[in-house]
A protein has these predicted regions:
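Conserved GNAT acetyl-CoA-binding A-motif
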Residues: 62-67, 90-103
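Conserved acetyl-CoA-binding loop-helix of GNAT-fold acetyltransferases
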Residues: 75-90, 113
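Conserved acyl-donor/pantetheine-binding loop and adjacent beta-alpha core of acyl/acetyltransferases
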Residues: 14, 19-70, 74, 126-132
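Short glycine/proline-centered loop/turn elements that form peptide/ligand docking sites
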Residues: 79, 83, 104-109, 123-130
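Conserved beta-hairpin
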Residues: 1-13
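Conserved catalytic-core motifs of GNAT/GCN5-like acyltransferases
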Residues: 99-101, 117-135
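Conserved active-site tyrosine of GNAT-family acetyltransferases
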Residues: 110-112, 116
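Active-site beta-strand termini and strand-to-loop segments that position acidic
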Residues: 3-5, 140-143
Length: 143
């Protein structure tokens, strides 16, 4: 995480190895029970989309590689600093590549401008019915 001079968190990064598994079914069941029908429908669509693109990203990966699973920044420059700190940590751990996925709702143009290579691009089978033409991009970068 990145904390500013004001003591507020301005960015967060999470990453995992390609073979990491997390069972979120109980959490998902609990959270869905608190939702309206409309919220539940939207939540399931987004969760299914994330499972789809995470799976496609992991298929591109091998041992010794890591996936950026969450990258949020609300202050200009904070994300770049967080990403560099993370890359330094991964280099220290002798990891080879960092993978991530992004889509047309994000600033996906950032990644090729900062040394990432596009390794996949596709229209989501899950999300296309909700947002036709919604494109997902998979990038990788050497560590």
């Amino acid at each position: 995480k990145a904390v500013g001079d004001d003591g507020m968190i301005h960015g967060v990064l999470f990453a995992n190895f390609h073979d990491d598994k997390a069972d979120v079914s109980q959490w998902r069941e609990n959270i869905e029970a608190q939702m309206t029908d409309h919220e539940r429908e939207r939540f399931r669509l987004l969760a299914d989309y994330m499972l789809e693109v995470d799976g496609k990203t992991v298929q591109c990966m091998s041992d010794g590689e890591v996936k950026l699973s969450l990258f949020i920044s609300n202050q200009k420059g904070c994300g770049k600093l967080l990403l560099q700190e993370m890359m330094d940590e991964f280099l220290h751990r002798d990891l080879r590549h960092l993978y991530l996925w992004t889509d047309t709702s994000c600033t996906h143009e950032y990644y090729p401008q900062h040394g990432f290579t596009l390794v996949g691009q596709f229209l989501s089978e899950v999300y296309d019915s909700y947002a036709p033409g919604y494109t997902t991009y998979i990038y990788k970068k050497g560590i």
